[in-house]
């Protein structure tokens, strides 16, 4: 119902005008709009908060991930550091291992070379023993450079390692081949051979003198054993003869083995057996024909045996008290070529056969023993022989009748083999004089402060048998050069050789080494003196330079 109409204003029943109602509606709309805006604003803020929360969550998550990554990186870094340390340690270990391996390789190389050399040495040494008759058993094979067939590798040094220092002291009296704890091989030898007053030289060092004893008596201490079976070797021969000598009571130098060394030639089936003493070697002569490995063997004196000189060294006949029955032998079963009635027959034509020579000799009576000396290599006669008659009373008759007889282009020389033993013959006098000079020389050289020279003299190195063969001689020269130039500049090596006509050679058996300076010779003397060469103990002394330059090798 409208209350007012005159002024155009409508008023409702409640008394409100339309205008006010319109305003009121606007206000309500505005409030609604404001509320809507507030709601929208709140929604926006909520969205922002949610977005912020989500962002914070994402940030936290990223931060956590980043921390985890950092942690992993740190862990990886530690692993890397550990790996780096391990790598460095491994590198160091590898480097050390490589160095050790290189050192081991070098050592192995040296050892391998040494082993190869030793193996070749042993092989060559065995070949030499098998194929050559000389005392050290050198091989017949020679190097191609010498145009000899079959070929042979280079000779191996005969030197062994240096002996203990006690072997070089004056009190060390055990000589090469002498069993420790036993008496010397030849008691009283030097009082008979070298009548030198003790005041003349004073107390001599024993080692060089005993070494000289071994050299001086070697020819009388060796026996030749022929007819060996193919299976024989050095060890079996040494064991057999040591056992047999003990069984017959032939050991006179004390307890232990009588055999010192054995040099065997497998091709020619013979050996040289070296005994401890002259007396034991003489006892071994009673073993001629003894059964060895199923067959008899011949036991003889070697070709270098000197009966005249041996007579001054010890018994030359076997002991009559030997128990030969212990080995199945009987006294007198040997060839009977020993004793004062032994005859030397020289100047025989080389083409004479053994039967022809026997026929000539037996024209004076039956022979108890006969031995035609033959070349070990070729088997040909050397032009001389030895014999003993059953009736010794015909000995001088045969000598007088046969001596001086012309046989073809030769003239016979027939005499007692031991003729002149009461007085030293020229050869014996030479040996004794040489021994006296050697003692005097060594006494001077071994005195404290003795004058050193550039020349060194070695004894106890080579034997006469080894110097006769040209190729053996060249081998020894090479051997000496190879070994001795290790100590200094080696200028010259001189090794005197035997004269083919039998005239004594000054310095025979010695080796002279000339160095560029005294330092080299002094080192060589220190390194070589007392060492073993082929089983012999080497004696090294300085030698006067003026004598060496003049070719005087006798002092």
From Swiss-Prot:
Tissue expression notes: Expressed in stems, leaves and apical buds.
Cell compartment(s), UniProt: Nucleus
Major localization class: nucleus
Gene3D superfamilies named among the record's database cross-references: 3.30.70.330
Pfam family, one: RRM_1
Feature: compositional bias, Basic and acidic residues: 23-81, 90-127
Name of the protein in its database record: Splicing factor U2af large subunit A
Protein species of origin: Nicotiana plumbaginifolia (Leadwort-leaved tobacco)
